[in-house]
Each structure stands twice: as structure tokens, then as C-alpha cells.
């Protein structure tokens, strides 16, 4: 049997948990500008499947790529790295 391709794993911050079983995670990366060589900060938002509604806004989470779960969801929650501090 052929080996399955490795799935992408990202770490990011939960920016929204208002949907049922879905969270929005913002993943930030740093890339070099091709001409000027300056380090630029980029961020991208992903819809992530959260089966038990455990993640809350502000948490740092790890997400993994998976099969399409809906029109926009292609990631699932692996674990919560750090809980948000409630003030």
C-alpha cells in the first residue's frame, strides 16, 4: 500500500468560536520579500473543525489538514497548546 502524503500542521490563535463545532484560527508566518529581502509578516485565517467545542477565543491551538468537511473547512483541531488568560 502506498504511503499517505504528510498532512500540513499549523499553530495559530483562535479569533472566533461563535459557530457550532467550528473555530476560526489565524496562522501567522514570516516570509522574506523577494526583491528587498525584508522580513514580512503574513497571516491567514482557516476554518477548523472542533468536534467538542473545546477551544475558546484567544487560545493557541495546533491544527492539521484533513479531507474537506464543508465548503470552507479543510482543517481539524489537534490540541490546545495554551489556554487564553481570562482577565
UniProtKB/Swiss-Prot annotation:
- Lineage: superkingdom: Bacteria
Going by the UniProt record, its keywords in alphabetical order are: Ribonucleoprotein, Ribosomal protein, RNA-binding, rRNA-binding
The yes or no answer to whether the keyword Ribonucleoprotein is present is yes
Molecular function GO terms recorded: rRNA binding; structural constituent of ribosome
Query: Per its UniProt record, what SUPFAM superfamilies does this chain match?
Result: Nucleic acid-binding proteins
Q: Family membership, please give it.
A: Belongs to the universal ribosomal protein uS17 family.
On assembly, the entry states:
Part of the 30S ribosomal subunit.
Q: What does this protein do?
A: One of the primary rRNA binding proteins, it binds specifically to the 5'-end of 16S ribosomal RNA.
Which NCBIfam families does this UniProt record tie to the protein?
PRK05610.1, uS17_bact
According to UniProt, the name of this protein is Small ribosomal subunit protein uS17
The source organism is Lacticaseibacillus paracasei (strain ATCC 334 / BCRC 17002 / CCUG 31169 / CIP 107868 / KCTC 3260 / NRRL B-441)
